[in-house]
């Protein structure tokens, strides 16, 4: 009986310790952003005929999302979501494949494959791969709401033919 009481008292203090640890974890700030609607709004606007006219197959290059925030963002997942949204809206748009991007980044001496390219390097890279349009995307801000910006750049001239920002909550 005494052994049972000692065990019960120890169990209570142990469960209190678990509860304190759980409440500390619970207070951690996790930020869940909804990129889907922001991307949808930007892509719908970008693909309007007054911004871009696509009548036959066009090759696009979209580099990894640039993260200018103080939070972790799965840049590859967001980049793939942007590609997917564009592909749904227009099946004449094709993207430079990931393995081709990786191979050509190594070829021109870019050692950090997972790093976003600056615009001039991305345009140089696009020209070497016969790409017509380059899409630059970036998320910025220190606090909510964060801003998602997508730019559509005509590779031939380097002109930004479309740019839009949307808030992500």
Swiss-Prot record:
Pfam families: LpoB. Coiled coil: none annotated. GO terms for biological process: peptidoglycan biosynthetic process. InterPro entries: LpoB. One of its GO terms (molecular function) is enzyme regulator activity. GO terms for cellular component: periplasmic side of cell outer membrane. This is Uncharacterized protein BU358. It comes from Buchnera aphidicola subsp. Acyrthosiphon pisum (strain APS) (Acyrthosiphon pisum symbiotic bacterium).
